[in-house]
Amino acid sequence: MKILMRADTHVSFSVPADGLKANFTFSQVLAALSVSLCSLVVGFVSAYTSPALVSMTDRTITSFEVTKDAGSWVGGIMPLAALAGGITGGPLIEYLGRRSTILATAVPFIVSSLLIACAVNVIMILCGRFLTGFCVGIASLSLPVYLGETLQPEVRGTLGLLPTALGNIGILVCYVAGSFMNWSMLAFLGAALPVPFLILMIIIPETPRWFVNRGQEERARKALKWLRGKEADVEPELKELMQSQADADRQATQNTCLELFKRNNLKPLSISLGLMFFQQFSGINAVIFYTVQIFKDAGSTIDSNLSTIIVGVVNFFATFMGIILIDRLGRKILLYVSDIAMIVTLSILGGFFYCKAHGPDVSHLGWLPLTCFVIYILGFSLGFGPIPWLMMGEILPAKIRGPAASVVTAFNWFCTFVVTKTFQDLTVAMGAHGAFWLFGAICIVGLFFVIIFVPETRGKSLEEIERKMMGRVPMSSVVNIKPFPFNM
């Protein structure tokens, strides 16, 4: 049975509509798992402030004073540093390679956590968080590019969500450990997490596309053999890679910045930027960074630390649901479901906090914030959490993938910084209800953005996606009606 959502959005509820068969080679799974362990570290450090600030601001535990303003900077400086890391990461993945850039973040991740763990003043914590954020920015840019360039189309959706799954495990580990560890011990745990990632990253190869871009055909062939299996015939794929690179070289200009603003490149860049905007302005990082405080403010009858653990568990399992569904239903259907779930729950949360502030009495509804948060996290983790990152690695053209991904990542972290740094001020100015209703209204706009502009990429090779985005191949007669400017 199929549902027609748009000309490019066909969904099968039994098997993939185009009969694609997954090809999970051990080497592809190992490559995806290796880089995804970096995402586990990212998830842990991103969630760190939620449990850590509680003990960090307790003068009986901490030998130095952490004011409310300083505490907001402990949470807010990481996305600001990630913005800088995102800008830096674009040139790095082009010159050093995707794998080498990811690997280079491992030791700084360890050092930054040790700096926080051994801190004797707020400045040391802020320096550690800044270095952490800088590495997070580089990693969040590099991971989807690496996976997009190494995984086959049949498994790119499933294995491409592994970073999100392990990132959510990192968040869950942080929540669970934070319920019985103080901020210093939690940071020591954070310093240990990058070690397995560091070891495994040494084993896997660079992406074949990067080798082709560097004119290293033989090394590209060896990388493909490693990824596809020794018995696989990689010559057709290598030939397609080299042809795609030749096409890109013919159309390229000397100035990379000018390339970004060419009409054909601006279209996928704008779509990717839009997805990142609606991802962050759904309010997700305000929820993650300030979960404990939000539950306290709501007067929830459930222990706040237990609440965060429950949210983390839901986040984890929702991502695995996404892994199962993404190559069956496609990207757009999951984005629709995600957006609708967030709109409904944010509206209800806004209503709860409005009644709490202005009446009637809702003290007997202490379970409601947790229920809404669970559904909100479930919806976000199914779609708007992982898919913007996955699609960034899919729809950006090969020739500008590094600098374009840098722009998109920096923009994402800028939005993250704005949301996390202003969330507390926003709740003061508008009330918690106003903040949640504002995020809900933005989600409504995001739903229309997905319907109108976002293409479906399920089962397509990166070369096919690029050709269609550039308009180099004819579309089906239905799609050629082109009711929307960015239709694919």
Curated annotation (Swiss-Prot):
* Family the entry assigns: Belongs to the major facilitator superfamily. Sugar transporter (TC 2.A.1.1) family. Trehalose transporter subfamily.
- Annotated GO CC locations: membrane; plasma membrane
TM region positions: 29-49, 73-93, 106-126, 130-150, 161-181, 185-205, 269-289, 306-326, 333-353, 373-393, 403-423, 434-454
Give the matching InterPro entries: MFS_dom, MFS_ERD6/Tret1-like, MFS_sugar_transport-like, MFS_trans_sf, MFS_Trehalose_Transporter, Sugar/inositol_transpt, Sugar_transporter_CS
What PROSITE patterns does UniProt report for this protein, alphabetically?
MFS, SUGAR_TRANSPORT_1, SUGAR_TRANSPORT_2
Q: Which residues lie on this side of the membrane: Cytoplasmic?
A: 1-28, 94-105, 151-160, 206-268, 327-332, 394-402, 455-488
> Is Nucleotidyltransferase found in the keyword set?
no
Annotated signal sequence range: none
Source superkingdom? Eukaryota
Q: Which GO terms describe its molecular function?
A: sugar transmembrane transporter activity; transmembrane transporter activity
Extracellular compartment spans: 50-72, 127-129, 182-184, 290-305, 354-372, 424-433
Q: Which Gene3D superfamilies match?
A: MFS general substrate transporter like domains
Pfam families xref list: Sugar_tr (PF00083)
Q: What is its main location?
A: membrane
- Protein name from the UniProt record: Trehalose transporter 1-like protein
